[in-house]
C-alpha cells in the first residue's frame, strides 16, 4: 500500500502498522548508534499554526537524527503573509516547492486534508482542530502498547478524560478498531463523552465498548489506562473529578503488569506520586515519539 500523506488513523492497515513498527525498532538501534546521514538530502517544513512543544520538537529531532534539515515555525498565523490572510492552500503550494515533507498543525479540523490536496510532497497531520485527529500521536501510543505486550489483539483499555473533543483519543480508537477482540471502556463525565462518529465506527467494525463515568470499577480489569486531560472548569460536578484521575489508591486496584499512558501535558488527572510506579509509561511513551516519527518519515520517502 502506497502512503502518500498521513492525514488520519483510518489510513493504516494492520500490515502497514506492523511494517511501521518493524522500522521503528530499526530506528531505535540507529539512534543508539548516533543516528544516520542517509536522508541528508531531505528538508522537512514544520508548519504549526498552533503552539506545540512535544510534537514539534519530536518531529524536528527525528529529522535531525535522520541527517536531514528543518524549516520551522510554530507562529505561522502571525507571519506577515498570514496577517494578510493568505489561504492555507497557497502557503502549502509554495512551501511544498522547496521541501520534501510538510508537518502541519492547522487551526481548523480538515486543514491537513486540504493541504494534502495541493501539496507536491507528503503532508503529515500533526493535530488538526480541537476535535479532529492526531494520527502520529496515536501511532506512538499504539507502538508503546505493542512494544510492551508484543500483541494488540485481545487488549482491554480504558480511555479516560475529556473525550468529546480529544483528538488523540479519537485517533487511537480508530487504530484499535483494526485488531481482534479489543474492548474499550470510554470513561468521562456525562457532558464530555466520546462523540457519536467514533461510536458508529466501532459499531460498524464490531468493536466492543461501553461508556462509563468512573474508572474505579474497571481499574482491575484493564491492560491499559489511556488517561487524557481533564480540566476542572469543564466538569460540572467538581466533586466527581476523582472518578477520572489516577492516584495511589487506584494503583492498588490495577493489574501488576498494566500500563498507564498519557499523551501529555497533564494537569490534575495523574498525581505526581504515580510517576515512580513501573506501570507509569507516559514518559517512555513520549520518548517513543522520536523513533516512531523517524520510521514514519522513512516509510513515506522509501515508498515514493
What label would you give each PLM region?
Residues 1-57, 61:
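Positively charged, low-complexity intrinsically disordered leader regions
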Residues 43, 48-98:
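Active-site cofactor/substrate anionic-group-binding motifs, chiefly glycine-
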Amino acid at each position: 500500500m502506497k502512503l502518500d500523506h498521513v492525514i488520519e488513523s483510518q489510513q493504516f492497515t494492520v500490515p502497514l502498522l506492523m511494517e511501521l513498527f518493524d522500522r521503528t525498532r530499526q530506528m531505535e538501534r540507529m539512534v543508539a548508534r548516533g543516528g544516520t546521514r542517509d536522508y541528508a538530502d531531505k528538508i522537512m517544513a514544520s508548519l504549526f499554526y498552533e503552539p506545540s512543544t512535544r510534537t514539534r520538537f519530536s518531529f524536528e529531532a527525528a529529522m535531525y537524527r535522520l541527517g536531514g534539515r528543518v524549516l520551522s515555525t510554530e507562529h505561522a498565523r502571525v507571519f506577515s503573509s498570514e496577517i494578510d490572510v493568505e489561504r492555507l492552500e497557497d502557503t502549502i503550494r509554495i512551501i511544498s516547492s522547496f521541501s520534501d515533507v510538510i508537518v502541519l498543525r492547522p487551526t481548523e479540523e480538515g486543514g491537513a486534508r486540504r493541504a494534502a490536496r495541493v501539496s507536491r510532497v507528503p503532508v503529515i497531520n500533526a493535530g488538526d482542530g480541537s476535535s479532529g485527529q492526531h494520527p502520529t500521536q496515536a501511532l506512538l501510543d499504539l507502538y508503546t502498547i505493542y512494544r510492551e505486550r508484543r500483541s494488540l489483539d485481545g487488549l482491554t483499555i480504558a480511555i479516560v478524560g475529556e473525550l468529546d473533543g480529544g483528538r488523540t483519543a479519537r485517533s487511537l480508537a480508530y487504530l484499535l478498531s483494526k485488531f481482534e477482540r479489543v474492548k474499550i471502556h470510554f470513561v468521562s463525565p456525562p457532558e464530555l463523552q466520546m462523540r457519536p462518529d467514533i461510536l458508529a465506527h466501532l459499531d460498524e467494525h464490531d468493536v466492543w465498548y461501553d461508556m462509563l463515568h468512573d474508572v474505579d470499577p474497571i481499574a482491575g480489569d484493564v491492560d491499559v489506562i489511556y488517561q487524557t486531560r481533564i480540566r476542572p472548569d469543564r466538569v460540572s460536578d467538581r466533586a466527581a473529578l476523582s472518578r477520572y484521575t489516577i492516584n495511589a489508591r487506584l494503583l492498588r486496584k490495577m493489574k501488576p503488569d498494566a500500563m498507564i499512558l498519557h499523551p501529555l501535558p497533564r494537569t490534575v488527572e495523574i498525581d505526581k506520586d504515580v510517576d515512580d510506579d513501573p506501570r507509569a509509561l507516559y514518559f517512555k511513551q513520549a520518548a517513543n515519539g522520536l523513533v516512531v516519527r523517524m520510521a514514519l518519515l522513512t516509510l513515506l520517502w522509501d515508498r515514493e
